[in-house]
């Protein structure tokens, strides 16, 4: 059951990424048709923009991400218990030892970052380290180490970059149309061509809806990677109850004291901001109750 869950989560992520690239291609083709009367040029430009933006975000400095989240790097001497758990989990996962950081915050939370296992880092709040016992900490750190081993940070970064690229292209296309853009051929003879009018309307609709759809796909990818990391943590620790107990404590945690931006929020094991009342479709994290239920069904 455990390996089946891991396999299913990986397959769902692949499907979502394929749909994401298809959406980026669609929005590029739509913008190309509306502005240049050339599908292919718009499609190629959209994919190039998406790849460049994703590449630049992937190689964002680990130290910068930690600084944005008020995390301080610690040594084995400063936090021996935390350091040794990270070391043990990294050894089991067969990845290099990540850098270790602590966030001075009473809430219960942790996250990992880094584009690859070779430049990764793990951070935990002081509240988490004080409240959780060793088995629960192993579950949480196993979750974060799994993110590193599974290249989740890179996948999530690509998803954020693609969503941003879709929004930018859609915004530029919409503004150019609003201020009189569009191909001359569309303005000259489009009114008499029913097919062209239908295509024009569909292209406009895609420009309007694409940013929302892109955000939903990006959030869905984030939620799938959380499920995968939960299951992968159990694979590392061989202790599902430790992870379940940790999630039950996380469920009672208060929001973090310092502001957390959207990109950073998706990295944490638990939503670090005040819980929102709207649909889980718009959440970076799946409901903790559902995560616990999946672990119990392994």
Curated annotation (Swiss-Prot):
Gene Ontology biological process terms, A to Z: proteolysis
Keyword Protease: yes
Protein name: Protease HtpX homolog
Top-level taxon: Bacteria
Primary enzyme class: hydrolase
Membrane-topology descriptor: Multi-pass membrane protein
Sorted UniProt keywords: Cell membrane, Hydrolase, Membrane, Metal-binding, Metalloprotease, Protease, Transmembrane, Transmembrane helix, Zinc
NCBIfam families with a match to the protein in the record: PRK04897.1
Gene: htpX
GO cellular component: plasma membrane
Membrane-spanning segments: 14-34, 39-59, 158-178, 197-217
Residue numbers binding Zn(2+): 143, 147, 226
Gene Ontology MF terms in the entry: metalloendopeptidase activity; zinc ion binding
E.C. code: 3.4.24.-
Family the UniProt entry places it in: Belongs to the peptidase M48B family.
Cofactor: binding comment: Binds 1 zinc ion per subunit.
């Amino acid at each position: 059951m455990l390996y089946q869950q891991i396999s299913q989560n990986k397959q769902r992520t692949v499907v979502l990424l394929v749909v994401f690239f298809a959406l980026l291609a669609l929005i590029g083709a739509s913008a190309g048709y509306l502005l240049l009367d050339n599908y292919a040029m718009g499609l190629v430009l959209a994919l190039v923009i998406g790849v460049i933006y994703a590449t630049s975000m992937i190689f964002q400095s680990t130290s910068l991400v930690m600084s944005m989240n008020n995390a301080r790097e610690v040594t084995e001497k400063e936090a021996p218990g935390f350091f040794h758990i990270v070391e043990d989990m990294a050894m089991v996962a067969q990845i290099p030892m990540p850098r270790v950081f602590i966030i001075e915050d009473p809430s219960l939370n942790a996250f990992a970052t880094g584009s690859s296992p070779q430049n990764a880092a793990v951070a935990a709040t002081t509240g988490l380290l004080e409240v959780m016992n060793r088995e629960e900490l192993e579950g949480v750190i196993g979750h974060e180490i799994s993110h590193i081993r599974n290249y989740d940070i890179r996948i999530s970064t690509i998803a954020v970059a693609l969503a941003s690229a879709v929004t930018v292209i859609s915004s530029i296309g919409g503004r150019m149309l609003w201020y009189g853009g569009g191909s001359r051929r569309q303005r000259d003879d489009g009114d008499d061509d029913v097919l062209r009018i239908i295509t024009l309307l569909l292209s406009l609709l895609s420009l309007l809806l694409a940013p929302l759809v892109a955000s939903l796909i990006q959030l869905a990818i984030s939620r799938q990677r959380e499920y995968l990391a939960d299951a992968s943590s159990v694979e590392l620790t061989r202790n599902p109850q430790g992870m379940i107990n940790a999630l039950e404590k996380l469920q009672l945690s208060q929001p973090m004291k310092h502001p957390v931006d959207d990109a950073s929020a998706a990295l944490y094991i638990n939503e670090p901001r005040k819980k929102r009342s709207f649909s889980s479709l718009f959440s970076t994290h799946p409901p903790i109750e559902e995560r616990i239920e999946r672990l119990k069904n392994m």
